Amino acid sequence: MGPKATEKKRKVQDAEPESDDEIAPDFDGALSQSEDEFDSDFDDNEHEQDGEQESGSEASDDEDEEGSLLSDDIPSDAEGDKAMGKLVLEDEEEELEIEIPGVDPKRPEKDDGDKNYRIEKDANGNERYVYDEIDPVYDSDDSDAQEAPNTIGNIPMSFYDSYPHIGYDINGKKIMRPATGDALDALLDSIEVPKGWTGLTDIHTGNPLNLNDDELELVRRVQMGMIPNELENPYPETVEYFTGIEEKMPLSAAPEPKRRFLPSKNEAKKIMKLVRAIREGRILPYKPPEEREKEEEEEEQYFDIWQDEVPQEVNPLHIPAPKLPPPGFDMSYNPPAEYLPTKEEREEWEKLDPEEREKEYLPQKYDSLRKVPGYGEIVKERFERCMDLYLAPRVRKNRLNIDPNSLLPKLPSPSELKPFPTVAQTVFRGHDGRVRSVAIDPTGVAVASGGDDGTVRVWELLTGRQVWSVKLSSEEAVNTVRWRPAKDSFILSAAVGEDVYLMVPTHASVTPALDQASRDILSAGFGYATNGQQHGAAPGKEPPAKWARPGAKLEDEGVLIRITVRSTVKVINWHRKGDHFATVSPSGQRSSVAIHTLSKHLTQIPFRKLSGLAQTASFHPLRPLFFVATQRTIRCYDLQKLELVKVVQPGAKWISSFDIHPGGDNLIVGSYDKRLLWHDLDLSIRPYKTMRFHSEAVRQVKYHRGGLPLFADASDDGTLQIFHGKVPNDQLENPTIVPVKVLKGHKVVNKLGVLDMDWHPREPWCVSAGADGTIRLWM
C-alpha cells in the first residue's frame, strides 16, 4: 500500500539553507536525532522512496485542488511543504520534491496554530504533556542574557568524573554526559571541520566548543597582527604643543633665513648625479615589462633581516669627542679688509705673551692660494688637540625639556594692580556720524569732542550733559581737538581742514575771571603782527600760516582765532607750558610739521626737507626735545641745539600714533599693522616689548598723566586694551608690563572702531570716541 500524500519523506542534503526566511523559526532545535540515523535510513530506503514519490504525486495534486477550493485561509500542500522546509516544483505531469537540510522529516507537519507541547506515555501508561523548551531569542519575552545550561556553579568538574552526569539544569534535571566517539570519529571530525570548530570541549556541557562570528573575527585580527578592537585607532592624531595651543604672541619673531627661499644645492648635485648616470647608460629610465616583473618577483621574496644579527653590547661610558669649531673669515687667505690688523694692533699682539693672546695667529692677505706658505703651528695645535682629548674630561649634556610657560616671567594678578577702568559709566550721544577726536580738560571737569558733522561739543564728564557746541564747518570734519594744558586758562583748539581754531567755551565751572584771562591770552599776540606778515618770513614770500579773526558770528560763540596753514591738519599737540603747539599735515610735504607760538602769533616750519611723510609729532614732557614720527621711524630733535639726537626704529610698517611717558625715558607706539610697541629710550632704539593683542589697526595710544602706572590703546576692532606699565626708578630693572583689561562697547562701522581716547588727569578713568557716533566714559 502506497503512503499518503501527507506522509511524504524528505531527502536530507548536506548543504546549508540559503536564508533564514525559508525556514520557520519553530524548527530551531527540532532535530533530536543524530545525522548518522538519517544517513542510514536514507541508504536503506533509497529505492523505495523513488517509487513512493511517483505514486503519491497524483494524490497530492487532488488534495491540493480540494484544499484550495474549501478555504483561502488553509494553505495548500505546496505551501505547507514550503513551511516545513520543502521546495515543491509543480509540472503538468509530475511533481518534483527537493528536501532542504536542517528539517526533521519524521516530525509531523504543523499549521500556524501548532501547539508547543507533545503527548507522551508515562510509566503507568497515562498521557503526559511535555512542553518544548523556550528559546529566548531576541523576539521572545525573555530579553536577558542567556544563562549557562549547567547551574552547578564555579566548582571543579573533577567532582563529576565518577558520575554519568555532569551537572544539573535550571529545572533540577541531570545533564547527562554526552557520548564520546572513538579515534576514527575524532579523525573524521577533524577532517570535516565545521564553521567555528576549535577541537576543544566545554567542561560544563561536554559538547564541542565552537566560536561565533565575533570571536572568529577577533582571532582573525590577532593572527593578521591587527588591533583586536576595530574601533580603536592605533595612530591617533598627535597634537604638537606649538601648533595645538594657540599663542597670542609668537615665541620667536626672528625673520625667515635666506636659505628657506633658495633652491637646495645638495638636491641639485643629487639630480645631476642621476642625469649623468642616465647619459652614461648606468641607469635605464625605461625597463622592459619582463625585467620589471622579474624585479617585482624578487622584491616580493621575504626574509628575516635580523637572521644573522649578533647582539652588541652598548657602552654607555663612550662619549664622542667634541668637534673643532669651523674656521672664520679671519682664517681666509684673502680676508676682508676689516679683519686685517693695523700696524698698531700687530705691535700690540707681538708684545703680549703667547698665553695672553686672544688668538694664536694674525690674519694675513695673499693674492692667490698657491702663495700661501705652510702653517708652522700645525704640529703644536694637533698635539694640544690630542692632549685635550686625552686629559680633558667629557660630560654628556642632556637636552632640557622645558615648558615654554615656565620661561615667561611671573606676572602679578590683575586684581592686585587696581585701580584701572573696567566698566562703561556714561555714554555721550549727539554727534551725527563718526566722532574723530576726544579730549579731557586739565581740570578733569569737561570733555571736548569733534566729529564728521563739523561741530565741536563740550560735555560734563560725570553727567554726560552737553554744555556748549559750535558749528565750525558744514563740509569738512573736525579732525582733532586738544585743550591747552595750563590751568590758568580754559582754551580749546580744533582742526577743521586747513584751519586751526582757538576758542574759549562757556562752562559752569568757568568763572568770569578765568574766561577773561583766556581771552586776553589769545588776543595778546595780535600786537606782534605787522601788515599781516609773520615774523621770520622772507619779504615777498607767502607766510607759512595766517592768524586772523574768524568772524563776528563765531566770535560771539567763543571762537576767537583762526589759523590757516597750507594743507589739512590732522594732529595738534601742545607744549607743557601752553605757549607752543605743533600741527601735523601728512599731505603737506615740506610744510607738514609746523610749530606755532601763541603769545606772538608766530608760525615756523622747522624742516626744509623731511625724509618720509610725517604722521604725528609731540614735545618731550621734561626736556627741550621734539619728536616727529614718519611712516616707519620716529626722529628726536634737540630744540636748543637744533640737531638730530636719535632715530627710533619701531619696526612697524606704518606708525599711527605715539606717546611719551611722563618720566621721559619710555615711549609707546601704535601702528596700523595691529602692533603696540614699548621703547626704552635709554636702552635701545629698537622696541623693548612688542604686543599683538588686536585683530585690527591700532589708532591711538596714551599714557596716564596723573602718576598712575597705566597706559591704553584704541583699535579698529572696537576694543580698548588697558595695561599696567610700571617704570622703576632703578635703571637696572626692566619695566613691568601687564595687560589687565579689555574694554568692549563700541560698534565697528565700515571697518572702523575706536578712533581716539584720552585719560583723566587725576583719576583712573578714560574716555573713548568711536565710529558709531558715541563717546564712552570708562571707570
Swiss-Prot record:
Residue ranges with Acidic residues bias: 15-25, 34-67
Cell compartments where the protein resides: Nucleus, Nucleolus; Nucleus, Nucleoplasm
Keyword Repeat listed: yes
GO biological process: maturation of 5.8S rRNA from tricistronic rRNA transcript (SSU-rRNA, 5.8S rRNA, LSU-rRNA); maturation of LSU-rRNA from tricistronic rRNA transcript (SSU-rRNA, 5.8S rRNA, LSU-rRNA)
InterPro entries: BOP1/Erb1 (IPR028598), BOP1_N_dom (IPR012953), WD40/YVTN_repeat-like_dom_sf (IPR015943), WD40_repeat_CS (IPR019775), WD40_repeat_dom_sf (IPR036322), WD40_rpt (IPR001680)
Family annotation (Gene3D superfamilies): YVTN repeat-like/Quinoprotein amine dehydrogenase
Annotated Gene Ontology cellular component terms: nucleoplasm; PeBoW complex; preribosome, large subunit precursor
Role played: Component of the NOP7 complex, which is required for maturation of the 25S and 5.8S ribosomal RNAs and formation of the 60S ribosome.
UniProt protein name: Ribosome biogenesis protein erb1
Classification of source organism: Eukaryota, Fungi, Dikarya, Ascomycota, Pezizomycotina
Underlying gene: erb1
